[in-house]
């Protein structure tokens, strides 16, 4: 025979409310509370195989113990004095007295002492030597072998007597059945509370946000969201919770046990509810639907957070920036933006984040996990939202239309970001350089430039990138993959954005217009660079010669002059060029192709820029004016040469005689004089001349004679 060790006491299972909490209970809830407490006590007595004094137990069963009409009284005796403090509460014309928090603490302590005195007489069955322990919820914590097995639920117990008690609880009659859903209850009061769910009856309203509840206890718990009250503290770390259940869930974090494992991906969770919510990722199920906008969510928590979007009232305001929030927790998280606090740390790389969801997104970068696959093309995504947007690409569905230009978008956020292109709004500013962005995502990407962060490395060449998309585009250079094809001309591209921009060549669309001169461009970046022509800003400086440029592309092209790099080679003659456009124009010389024709005189040119310069001959336009003497020129090259006359600058020097010359053409003539070379040949007589000028003079004389 063994005695019960660490058996549960009545104080352990007692649900003790404070006076304020008790005042919030209505009549039906108080009756339900009474019945539950009495049943807990009966269960403990059955475990002990003894009972209290008959008068004491009947005293506990009387309703006046739980709901009194008069003021403070003293009544009853249980192994000593039990002080009963009565309180009158007026509600709807009736008086319903409530016993106080201190009263029940005293009663539960006395009942526990009485139970402790009975421990020595507790007898176990001879079935097993090891006792079991009963926790505060009257569930069984098994210690060793469990030979006795329940017939109904297959639950195992260490002792037959406890098994008998368990079977009694299992067989307890639930005589009150809901007509709507068939759910059964032991008490009629519990059934009445449950029926409010079907009727949609919500008697209790929140004064702050107007949310309605069908139970006053639910309202009380909800109000803690607005007040920030967290009465349940973790003894390990001191973290507070608004609900007792939240504390129970949190305590399992300290143990580290994750018994619930997903069969699909093997991910482990502390609670079964977390596993069920996670499994909806694989199934795609979203059972929680917003009544206002019909948007669906996987969890009720996400639905509740979404509901705040529709709430007009945002009572919690930030003192620093004035931004308002519907939840106090959201305000607390927002304050970290101002304080710079980042409480969520990545264990892989040590990076910290303000928001937990940002940490979750970041961790996927390390794991590379992409659990969401497109059935059409097999493409994988990290998030279900990414897959949802991608599916619309195959279906061609563009639900969201821009009212300005009629352009369609797959998501409302894309449309919202696009509309800023029309308004010019850039609400996201970089604190380092002051640059503005239309989207927060673009700002986050930009800030990596200041931090020098480039976490994505190419395995082929070792080059690093700040973004995964840039690495993906770069890898196509090595593989030669160009998955995006133009349906008009068949040209292929490595990026979808390049194809999108290229299509404007066929459509002639130039949506970006300069407000200064009216010139239009196919890309916003082209317009941005063009504006510097009017402002005169040249932010890109060459470190070799100090020359400034209005775009980084022009600077890169210029630097090839110093490095001598000419990566574009002509297969016909082997000549090299520093620009792709130059070799394209050069190839036309071999093919005698001159696609650009002057409408005035019919003269044709290999380059559009040549035609543009030639047309100034007909229009008389001379846009380049000398600030020194006021003389105007048709071309920038002649203007630059003319300015050397004023500055007395002679940059070109003959290597043979050391003579300094202003014009490159004069330098070439000088070098021909030194070498005796005659490169200009008359096609009629075959005579050669050192200079083109001499040949032109001869031809003019010949033409005049004829």
Curated annotation (Swiss-Prot):
Residues 8-78 form the KRAB domain. It holds the Pfam family KRAB. GO terms for cellular component: nucleus. Keywords: DNA-binding, Isopeptide bond, Metal-binding, Nucleus, Repeat, Transcription, Transcription regulation, Ubl conjugation, Zinc, Zinc-finger. It is found in: Nucleus. Gene3D superfamilies: 6.10.140.140, Classic Zinc Finger. GO terms for molecular function: DNA binding; zinc ion binding. A zinc finger (C2H2-type) spans 176-198, 204-226, 232-254, 260-282, 288-310, 316-338, 344-366, 372-394, 400-422, 428-450, 456-478, 484-506, 512-534, 540-562, 568-590, 596-618, 624-646, 652-674. The keyword Disulfide bond does not apply. The keyword DNA-binding applies. GO terms for biological process: regulation of transcription by RNA polymerase II. There is a cross-link at residue 61 (Glycyl lysine isopeptide (Lys-Gly) (interchain with G-Cter in SUMO2)). PROSITE patterns: KRAB (PS50805), ZINC_FINGER_C2H2_1 (PS00028), ZINC_FINGER_C2H2_2 (PS50157). Disulfide bonds: none annotated. Belongs to the krueppel C2H2-type zinc-finger protein family. May be involved in transcriptional regulation. This is Zinc finger protein 225. It comes from Homo sapiens. The lineage of its organism: Eukaryota, Metazoa, Chordata, Craniata, Vertebrata. The gene is ZNF225.
